Amino acid sequence: MRKPRVTLRHLAWSTMLLMVLGTGMLFWSAVRQQESTLAIRSIHQGASMPDGFSIWHHLDAHGIRFKSITPENDTLLITFDSSAQSAAAKAVLDKTLPRGYIIAQRENASQAVQWLSRLRDAPHRMG
């Protein structure tokens, strides 16, 4: 009985197949992440953030669902399942919140992108 030999051609095709599958999995994970976040902060430093309950009330009155409302430093972060919900919430909050607040879309970078930006922005000293 003959043993099958692994040739260079088989090894190359196997490696290429694994690379294509790995790239496809990375692409799929990036595409499926649809989460979107709004950040609300005051224009004037030291001014208070809007109350999370009032934000919830305004969004619920317009039928807009959200995942979470979280305070972070001097900013209130509202997380949504999709960018469409986030855009609708921004339109509602622009009308209902008093003047003096900035409502902006916040980028939700993946963990890999966050690590790459940390490495890129960190000062490197060689030599």
From Swiss-Prot:
Does the keyword Transmembrane feature in the UniProt annotation? yes
- Please give the InterPro entries that the UniProt record associates with this protein: Modulator_MzrA, SecD-TM
Q: Where in the cell is it found?
A: Cell inner membrane
The residue ranges crossing the membrane are 12-31
Output the Gene Ontology terms for molecular function. protein kinase binding
Q: Which protein is depicted?
A: Modulator protein MzrA
What job does this protein perform?
A: Modulates the activity of the EnvZ/OmpR two-component regulatory system, probably by directly modulating EnvZ enzymatic activity and increasing stability of phosphorylated OmpR.
Its membrane topology? Single-pass membrane protein
Which keywords are on file for this protein?
Cell inner membrane, Cell membrane, Membrane, Transmembrane, Transmembrane helix
The family note in this entry says: Belongs to the MzrA family.
- Keyword Cell membrane set for record: yes
Lineage start: Bacteria, Pseudomonadati, Pseudomonadota, Gammaproteobacteria, Enterobacterales
Q: Name one Pfam family in it.
A: SecD-TM1
Organism per entry: Citrobacter rodentium (strain ICC168) (Citrobacter freundii biotype 4280)
Which ranges make up the Periplasmic topological domains here? 32-127
